[in-house]
C-alpha cells in the first residue's frame, strides 16, 4: 500500500441537501466510503486534490483513502465506484468510493480501446462494435486501466471474440469465450454473432 497515491478526506457529520450545498461552496465534495465489510461512512473530499487524483487513477486504479476524524485516522485502499456531476457545471456533485481487499478479486468494468483500421473496412466492409467496455475479475492491483485491441487484421466476415483477448496475468472476464466483441460485415449484412444484453 505504500506506493499507492493517497487522498486525505474528513468524515462528514452534517447530512442532507443543505449541508451538501454548503460543502460545495467551500470546494468540498460530499461522498460515501463503502467499506469492504459493509459499513457506509459519509465523507467530504477536497475538490482539487480529488480532481487531480481522479485524472491520474481513473475508475479502475486503486489508491489509498485516509479518513481523518477527531477520534481516529483510518487508511484503506479504494477504487472510485460512482461519480455524479452537476448537469451544467463541470464539477463533481457526489462521489462513492469502494473499499477493497488487495488479495481478494473484485468485478469491475474496464474500457476497451480499439487501435488500427480494420482492413475489411478498406474494401467496403462495415465495422460493427458490440462492446466498448468489459467486465473483468481480478485482484485490485492487477486491474488494467483499459484493454487495448488491435483490429488492423480484421477482414470482412471476421470477428474478434473474448477468447482472442490477451488479458494480463491473473485477470479474467465474466463473458463466455465465444462472445464477439467486434466484427466487420458487409453493408446491410447480418452480424456474425447474435449479441445479447
Curated annotation (Swiss-Prot):
Sorted alphabetically, which keywords does the UniProt record give?
Answer: Ribonucleoprotein, Ribosomal protein, RNA-binding, rRNA-binding
Q: Which Pfam families match?
A: Ribosomal_L25p, Ribosomal_TL5_C
Q: Which GO terms describe its molecular function?
A: 5S rRNA binding; structural constituent of ribosome
Q: List the disulfide bonds.
A: none
One of this protein's GO BP terms? translation
| UniProt keyword annotation of Amino-acid biosynthesis present | no
* One Gene Ontology cellular component: cytosolic large ribosomal subunit
What is the recorded function of this protein according to its Swiss-Prot or TrEMBL entry? This is one of the proteins that binds to the 5S RNA in the ribosome where it forms part of the central protuberance.
Q: How does it assemble?
A: Part of the 50S ribosomal subunit; part of the 5S rRNA/L5/L18/L25 subcomplex. Contacts the 5S rRNA. Binds to the 5S rRNA independently of L5 and L18.
What family is it from? Belongs to the bacterial ribosomal protein bL25 family. CTC subfamily.
Q: What is this protein called?
A: Large ribosomal subunit protein bL25
Amino acid at each position: 500500500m505504500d506506493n499507492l497515491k493517497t487522498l486525505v478526506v474528513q468524515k462528514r457529520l452534517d447530512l442532507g441537501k443543505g449541508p451538501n450545498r454548503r460543502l460545495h461552496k467551500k470546494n468540498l465534495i460530499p461522498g460515501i466510503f463503502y467499506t469492504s465489510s459493509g459499513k457506509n461512512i459519509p465523507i467530504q473530499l477536497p475538490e482539487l486534490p480529488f480532481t487531480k487524483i481522479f485524472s491520474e487513477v481513473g475508475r479502475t486504479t486503486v489508491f489509498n483513502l485516509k479518513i481523518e476524524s477527531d477520534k481516529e485516522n483510518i487508511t484503506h485502499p479504494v477504487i472510485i465506484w460512482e461519480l455524479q456531476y452537476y448537469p451544467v457545471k463541470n464539477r463533481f456533485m457526489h462521489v462513492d468510493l469502494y473499499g477493497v481487499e488487495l488479495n481478494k478479486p473484485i468485478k469491475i468494468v474496464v474500457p476497451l480501446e480499439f487501435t488500427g483500421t480494420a482492413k475489411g473496412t478498406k474494401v467496403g466492409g462495415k465495422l460493427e462494435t458490440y462492446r466498448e467496455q468489459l467486465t473483468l475479475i481480478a485482484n485490485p492491483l492487477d486491474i488494467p486501466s483499459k484493454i487495448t485491441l488491435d483490429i488492423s487484421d480484421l477482414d470482412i466476415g471476421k470477428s474478434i471474440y473474448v477468447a482472442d483477448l490477451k488479458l494480463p496475468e491473473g485477470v479474467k472476464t465474466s463473458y463466455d469465450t465465444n462472445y464477439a466483441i467486434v466484427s466487420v460485415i458487409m453493408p446491410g449484412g447480418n452480424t456474425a454473432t447474435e449479441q445479447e444484453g
